[in-house]
């Protein structure tokens, strides 16, 4: 069920999984190790803004320590309704740098926080293939979390750690939570909770 509280929309009656900062960074390094142990050596790493960006940073750092240098960048996707107002279209921003740099013998890793519908990742890969043509590099996808029941594409992530159907609440996320949920599950903002409460109520 979705309810509105002032300017904010809050989902209730849905099981949430609160991810701690230390768990996410550990999973990011574990994800990088999984990619490395599989023998994949990306020389380009793309972090999908927002959630994939910090994970992408950790993956890039891990590879760097292991002696695998890579160029790295964050890109963004935006969802909007199509002409028929029934289908969701995806627009990708920030790929130009990669498109101009990559060659067919390069290896590219796309990093996101969660693979749910898969529509954004599918669009990113499609845009890369369309723009790069014969220079399209090998492309693989890595994410800590995968939601198979939500996947609307034929693609699954090449690398992932956890399968889940829960509502994932990442360390940086506050929007969509009630004050009570923030108070109970976000110790990082415990010193600010009273000020937050006065502002949004």
Regions found by a protein language model. Name each.
Residues 1-201:
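PRPP-associated nucleotide enzymes
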């Amino acid at each position: 069920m979705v309810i509105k509280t002032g300017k904010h929309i809050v989902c209730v009656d849905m099981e949430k999984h609160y991810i701690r900062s230390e768990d996410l960074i550990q999973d990011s390094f574990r994800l990088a190790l999984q990619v490395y142990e599989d023998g994949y050596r990306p020389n380009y790493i793309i972090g999908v803004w927002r959630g994939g960006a910090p994970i992408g940073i950790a993956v890039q750092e891990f590879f760097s320590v292991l002696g695998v240098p890579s160029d790295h960048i964050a890109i963004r996707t935006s969802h909007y309704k199509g002409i028929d107002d029934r289908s969701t279209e995806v627009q990708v921003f920030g790929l130009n740098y990669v498109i101009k740099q990559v060659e067919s013998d390069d290896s590219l890793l796309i990093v996101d926080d969660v693979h749910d519908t898969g529509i954004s990742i599918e669009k990113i890969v499609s845009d890369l293939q369309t723009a790069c043509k014969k220079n399209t590099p090998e492309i693989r996808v890595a994410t800590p979390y995968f939601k198979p029941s939500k996947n609307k594409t034929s693609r699954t992530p090449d690398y992932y750690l956890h399968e889940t159907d829960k509502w994932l609440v990442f360390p940086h996320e506050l929007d969509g939570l009630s004050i009570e949920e923030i108070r109970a599950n976000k110790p990082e903002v415990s010193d600010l909770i009273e000020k937050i409460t006065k502002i949004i109520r």
